[in-house]
Amino acid sequence: LRRMAVFALGLNQQEAESTKVRELTGGYFNAAYELTLADDRQGIVKIAPCTDRLLTYEKNIMQAEVEAMRLTEEKTAVPVPHIYCYDNTHHLCNSDYFFMEKLEGLPYSECMEWMTDTDRDQIEESLGRCNAQINGLKGLSFGCLGRIKEQKNSWREAFAVLLEDALDDGMRVSADLGVGYEEVRSPVSHNLDVLDEVSEPALVHWDLWAGNVFVKDGKITGITDFERALWGDPLMEHYFRMITEPK
């Protein structure tokens, strides 16, 4: 990690040796570490998992995250961590990795319970506006950001690819879905035409739950974890799922 910091942040050897490293264990996909430099500056390094343990749609997922974060930072007013360096050469590490700014505050999921109703309302309204700005970014084709060759001209085609990839992955590891694979594939495949209503590829975060929103003093300080971002239908966003879930 210290050698990576020398390369990514331009540290000298003495600065690297005095850098403090702390593993962050809240994530479920990438490995993440907090680095504190000798001058008390802090940053985060994220390291992608080994490629032999990935689902199909997770290929090139770190490339997708970096692209989505940089695009959001450049084209919107949504607060996202600044990326200092992205390295996919595998020269210093066998996996892709990137260094980014450390956000101030706490994940919204960790502090929402002791916030006032007014503060929660303000945070969630602000989050909705941020989400709308992300969805306001438009692409040229549909599909996962990190899988350009598999992107399609229609949302119907792109969603069909996502479905088949997920089912193929499940069959490969003998995952028990609770129903037969064809019971999932058949009804969806026969109704894919309804997706033709989605005519413009929008940037979709796809994992914008409270744990990926950092807040401080009643305000959003940043949004993280864009690795599952894709060009698709904004109704795939996390909070729209509540519309169909029974209370």
Question: Which residue ranges define each predicted feature?
Answer:
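Active-site Asp-x-Gly
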Residues: 156, 197, 201-204, 209-247
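A conserved long alpha-helix in the C-terminal portion of kinase-like catalytic domains
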Residues: 13, 173-183, 189, 221, ...
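Juxta-kinase regulatory segment immediately upstream of eukaryotic protein kinase catalytic domains
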Residues: 1-17
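Short Pro/Gly-enriched beta-strand edge/turn motifs at strand-loop
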Residues: 12-19, 64, 186-188, 193-195
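Extracytoplasmic/secreted proteins and extracellular or luminal domains
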Residues: 12-14, 76, 216
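Structural motif
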Residues: 9, 73-76, 245
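ATP-binding pocket architecture of kinase catalytic cores
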Residues: 19-175
